[in-house]
Amino acid sequence: MKASSGRCGLVRWLQVLLPFLLSLFPGALPVQIRYSIPEELAKNSVVGNLAKDLGLSVRDLPARKLRVSAEKEYFTVNPESGDLLVSDRIDREQICGKQPLCVLDFDTVAENPLNIFYIAVIVQDINDNTPLFKQTKINLKIGESTKPGTTFPLDPALDSDVGPNSLQRYHLNDNEYFDLAEKQTPDGRKYPELILQHSLDREEHSLHQLVLTAVDGGDPPQSGTTQIRVKVTDANDNPPVFSQDVYRVTLREDVPPGFFVLQVTATDRDEGVNAEITYSFHNVDEQVKHFFNLNEKTGEITTKDDLDFEIASSYTLSIEAKDPGDLAAHCSIQVEILDDNDCAPEVIVTSVFTPLPEDSPPGTVIALIKTRDRDSGENGEVYCQVLGNAKFILKSSSKNYYKLVTDGALDREEIPEYNLTITATDGGKPPLSSSIIVTLHISDVNDNAPVFQQTSYMVHVAENNPPGASIAQISASDPDLGPNGQVSYSIVASDLKPREILSYVSVSAQSGVVFAQRAFDHEQLRAFELTLQARDQGSPALSANVSLRVLVGDLNDNAPRVLYPALGSDGSALFDMVPRAAEPGYLVTKVVAVDADSGHNAWLSYHVLQASEPGLFSLGLRTGEVRTARALGDRDAARQRLLVAVRDGGQPPLSATATLHLIFADSLQEVLPDLSDRPEPSDPQAELQFYLVVALALISVLFFLAVILAISLRLRRSSRSDAWDCFQPGLSSKPGPGVLPSYSEGTLPYSYNLCVASQSAKTEFNFLNITPELIPAQDLLCDNASWEQNTNHGAAGVPFASDTILKQAPPNTDWRFSQAQRPGTSGSQNGDDTGTWPNNQFDTEMLQAMILASASEAADGSSTLGGGAGTMGLSARYGPQFTLQHVPDYRQNVYIPGSNATLTNAAGKRDGKAPAGGNGNKKKSGKKEKK
């Protein structure tokens, strides 16, 4: 007991003095920082301030990146304070087993510059394990002839703790026959032996019950117990005896399984059955049974499995020899294992800095590599190198530690990944080697700008495209990776106005597809150019530009538009008057049409669809000129109608129609009866108002009848027949030929006051059907005296509608037409630069004015309108001249009627004013006088 306590004290002193002795001789070993902690510390417990012990400033810790490099990281470094913290459970018994000194060695790495420090943490044992017996009950058979002092070895209790906390002593409960002794194996383990103090008498006590207790040295101590059941047997008084108590054997670790190790022999002086000995392992670890085999009859020991010096360098085998009388003897065998170069070196990558930027300079540290060989001596010396790549080398930083650094420029676009083979070779004979492959990924740097597939793009887009349709796609590639290679597209410039770019086109930032934001119109925009940019997502971003020219193609989407003949404001057709004596080839009129398209789509042709008298007129295919094909015959009607179609050259062609009303007459008097024959167009609005009035009248008949009666009485008292005063006594008015309402409206500065009967229910002008021989033509108009006598004013001084009637003057010479005013092709006359296209309203007003003026002149026989060969009857082409503003390709299709002559206003003369020009503002007096 005293010897065991002395050894424990020596171990404690060594644990205390060893760090102190190492500090006195710093040059003897590499610089290493040691800490001492108890096992089973809580996680994040502070071991010590590693930064302070290494001489590192706390301010430099983020830059130095101090960290622990170990295969199993029991510790970690606080990056802010530099404290070494416990990061995992530390169980001394699991890590070091029964070793008296448990040290955890690991490395710490600091960067900028790169340094490696060696750290050792001594793990101190705590009393966290209770001594335990393998069996809760031990059965012994002892012969009654056994002499006092005989010992019986017992299975020891197991305590995983070491030092003072390990198993310290055994004690047996008080009894009369047995005592307890403590023994120690060569490796220092304690086991109990039961000592017989007095001779046994089976007849007196055949069974003895004992309690064995194992106690450790902890504070407080822990203990474990087992029961010993001793059965007293009959006499077999000679136990087996081994030739020696301890055997020693040396083996190489490369011996094969089944290799003979040793044969033990025991003798028994008994005879017969009591002398038969059986051998068995006694009180050995399972590891011993795994590697060694014992023949229970012969005592021969052989290897059972491959031995490994790196796992265990020695084994202790306890052998028991027992006879049939359960008498036994014990011996131990010490087996020493010799090292052989059977372990290849190991390559351990402790840190890999991946991915590596492709612009890293030579000498950049990529990885930290550690080598290890479990063999000893020369077999454990290792040399390391990189195979087959000239851009990387290994630099030795300390024993068994290397840095993998770059030795050349890198290009990710050329080689995005490296598989580096690192080989380690030991110094054994023959040498063993091993290798490991380190995969190094090269990270991308934005060093490549996007590149378009074409230097420029040109696309053709047909007009009237649907909005949102794709019209082109541009594509650019970037060999960079990730965001550096992700290309986005945008429009950066255009020959369009800045505000119009987004309304015309847009580009998809991801796909590069160019979309039309609106339907293109070839007539408005024939081509435009965009500057598109491809930009990557790098920092800084790189970009490239390309031009895209968009040509808008023409479609036949515009039908021809007939400018002449035009319809009146109420939809009525105009008339052209042709002299009866017109010769074949006489230019009657010209159909004028335009097409907003271009090219063949605007090439117009003119065709006669229908004619009231086929063969009487001919139509120019390209000019639209209507000429007489033959002279007017006696059987030909005076009124002719031509339906003309105007077609363009598109596919399919579009067309428009125009209706020409031609009248063969030598004077305007012949035209007026034809005009009166036309039916008055129905007024849907008037009919609707009529039905509304009827409906309202049915609801309140009595009220409306009273109102109508009152109004009628008032009108009868106050009405004056102003219209009848305009004529000579004896004349009467009756409804005559009706003129279309469009002839009573206009913008020309003339007033035509026609006498209207008060009983007339019609709203149009009525001409008097008068015999020229009885009454002069000038009597149709009111003279000044008659007008003055019949002028009435209301109570408030406001003149009545009849007060606005003025005397009409005969037309001046501006209504005579010269040869230059006859129709012709475009460009035959010098057009007025300020002229505009004629419209239906203007044509109607001109025809209205000419009809009324002709009616006035016809009364005195002085009219020349329509009577001469050089005139064109009632055609509206004698209005102010205009200039066509159209594409120059088809000017021959444009007809410019009329002239620039300024019309002299007869009313203006009467008022003392200069006559207004043909293009001036014209007073619409027709409607007012009609009212």
Curated annotation (Swiss-Prot):
Residues 31-691 are extracellular. Residues 1-30 form the signal peptide. GO terms for biological process: cell adhesion; homophilic cell adhesion via plasma membrane adhesion molecules; nervous system development. Residues 921-931 have a biased composition (Basic residues). Glycans are attached at N419, N545. GO terms for cellular component: plasma membrane. This is Protocadherin gamma-B2. It comes from Pan troglodytes (Chimpanzee). The gene is PCDHGB2.
